[in-house]
Structures are given as structure tokens and as C-alpha cells.
Design a protein with these regions (language model features):
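Sec-dependent signal peptide recognition
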Residues: 2-10
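C-terminal motif of bacterial Sec signal peptides marking the signal peptidase cleavage site
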Residues: 13-16
Length: 145
């Protein structure tokens, strides 16, 4: 009985050492997250379909954050905001998004909606990660002028 106590204690200690992720980057497939796959594809291919899919992934990551901190991963709000503040993105989304992709937004005026949402995302990035203010504040100023 005395020889089992160290084994049981060791098992308990080792089982409590599991790590939990601070941020959720999307489901993985072979170690590559869905976000990484879509981001790589949309920035390299620049196809309307891949950009529409990326917008949906960003929106999900921002509105339903997972992980122990329950906030979007660092840089996601800024990337999403930058994409939305691009004037071509709203037009591209209006023309090429599927019905289910469009249903995540309550408006059909994507130009105005994306501009507001883009600025909001940049502000969220600074709120979640204050150290990013040095970079994000001038970027907001430049993009919204």
C-alpha cells in the first residue's frame, strides 16, 4: 500500500501539468489551422472566393473567441480591420459572397458596414493588446483619412 502512494501522487501531479491554449486559431488539419490555410490562400491567390471565406473565418474568431483568455488571438482584429478598411473588399464581398456568407452581416451596404467594422476591429486590437497602439493608431489615421 505504501508503495502505491508515490505512484498515485506522481500520476496526479503529471496529469495536472497539461497546458491549455491562451488563444484559439481555428481547428487544425495536420498541424495547420483553418485560419492559416485561408489566410495563406487569400493573400497569395487574391481570389474573391478565398477572401470571402477569410472574412467569415475572421468574423467567427472575433465574435466567438475561445481559449483561456476568451479574446481573439494577437493581430487578428488588426488583420481583419485592415482587410475591411480596404475599399475594394466591400465591393468584392457584395459581388462574390454566398448567401450564407452574407448572412453574418445585418446590412446590405457593405461599404459603410465594412468601414465601421474595420475601425471597430482596429480599436479592439488596441484595447485587447495595448502594446499594439504604437503601430495601430497611425495605421487607423492613415486608413481613415
Amino acid at each position: 500500500m505504501k508503495s502505491l502512494i508515490p505512484v498515485i501522487v506522481s500520476c496526479m501531479v503529471l496529469s495536472s501539468c497539461g497546458t491549455t491554449a491562451l488563444y484559439y486559431w481555428g481547428g487544425t488539419s495536420n498541424g495547420v489551422t483553418k485560419y492559416e490555410q485561408l489566410a495563406y490562400k487569400s493573400y497569395n491567390d487574391q481570389t474573391p472566393e478565398s477572401i470571402c471565406k477569410l472574412i467569415v473565418v475572421y468574423e467567427d474568431m472575433v465574435t466567438h473567441p475561445k481559449g483561456t483568455r476568451n479574446v481573439p488571438p494577437p493581430g487578428i482584429c488588426a488583420e481583419y480591420g485592415y482587410l475591411l478598411l480596404n475599399p475594394d473588399t466591400a465591393e468584392l464581398f457584395a459581388k462574390h459572397a454566398t448567401f450564407s456568407q452574407r448572412s453574418i452581416f445585418d446590412s446590405s451596404d457593405y461599404r459603410q458596414l465594412f468601414r465601421q467594422r474595420g475601425e471597430e476591429m482596429m480599436e479592439k486590437e488596441m484595447a485587447f493588446y495595448p502594446e499594439s497602439t504604437t503601430f495601430i493608431a497611425p495605421l487607423i489615421k492613415r486608413l481613415t483619412e
